[in-house]
Amino acid sequence: KISLLNASAFEKEVNGKLVSLYTIDSGNGLVVQVTNLGLRVVSIWTADKDGEYADVAVGYENIDRYLNNEGERFLGSIVGRYANRISKGRFMIDSVQYQLPLNNNGQTLHGGLKGLDMRVWNVDRISDKSIDFSYVSPDNEEGFPGTLNIKVRYSVTSENEFKIIYEATTDKPTVVNLSNHAFFNLKGESGGTITDHILTINADSITLVDSLLIPTGEIVSVDGTPFDFRNPVVIGSRINMEDEQLRNGLGYDHNWVLKRTEAKVRLIASLYEPQSGRLMEVYTDQPG
């Protein structure tokens, strides 16, 4: 049985724009609920090996908990304009230095103090299986140069794929790095630890980070390290090993350098939960 969240718990006016909850359905056993506040993935319903449904995306049951940043600010959201950390919030373009607001240990994380995760997005088109969203980030919003026109499509397919497509255009040179910050538990969101999930990542190397989680620029092989997931590994089996990178990340909080193939969109990771029999495969055209 699928217990969809009540849309009325998400209906609210935020900064003069209406926030709501939207549902897309594959028609074949995958139902996804999202809100236009930060394009948050609120729930993903799918069956286990016995046909029992559970919500495998970690999320909140009402909009106020997202607005109040209870717990994890980026829960299920789009992140940007720039995902991950920018050291000291500074970068140079064409000999001009830009300084961004600092919101994470003296760094800029996931777009700054009020990134794309806290913006109310326009809903441009809705069908049973897809939703098109857009947002115009004005020049100098959170310190970033250029007006950024962003379009994002969330869709599901009859093959039970959940797809996210990003598109962004700008009117002057800028930096942009969009991603999604969904959290998954294939036992169901109240299923407890995910350390017994089995993970595979098609990557030979990672980018090292320092103690503030800023990439050092060094790319190192995963050979002989707790970061080697080229063959299926139980997530928790090596997470407590003595390793500087695990210490810096308080576990796994890293970028894997994905293998390139002829195919633009390729399988880069899979996650399997033996108890439920749920398998999630991840495809991308991105490098990490």
Residue ranges and their predicted role:
Residues 2-32, 36-288:
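An exposed, glycine/acidic-rich loop-and-rim segment of catalytic or binding clefts
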